[in-house]
């Protein structure tokens, strides 16, 4: 899918969505197939998913904790494969249900919606017009990196990592190949981040990334389709750059491929 802005111009610098407000929040659905509960959308796992029991229009509704958010994201879904049109709506006691966006994706890759200002609702609802699976839903305050990335970075969705087994005959003929695991991997390097900015903003993400995945788009304005839902394989730790009051940080993102 993509990262898009609603009354918001996407920047050149990376956007990260972590610190999900929806983790562990109550969730209900108009219906749920066996083994596909509504509660699946409020944990960060990609293999647990909600799916309605029948076709036609269905919805999953998630309680919000009464905190501001400016970004919503969806991952681990089959909306593109199933040709689904979905609508995200928010509920408040003053306005009732307010539609935020309607989309018809063509792939199963992550979707990220960035608002130009913070919102607050008591509930979030995702309505789909036909049967599909949704595994991950995030809402929170995005982290806008102050520095852009240009040279030396492998775009996330081009950094394919594939583990496979190749079958060959005794005479060396190619007999086939079995893909055992496929995903993405990309390394991020940021230099000269202000120490105060790091402690106030980036460190919240670094702490959350110890236990939870996150959404990241490396160049939103130019490559809005290149967004992934991934995790780090080690703790994110900064280094003092030695120049005035700056910190450098490096980390690697590993992501599952859904599209």
What do these predicted regions represent?
Residues 85-89:
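Beta-strand signatures of extracellular beta-sandwich domains
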Residues 1-59, 63-83, 94-96, 100-259:
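Extracellular/virion structural assembly segments
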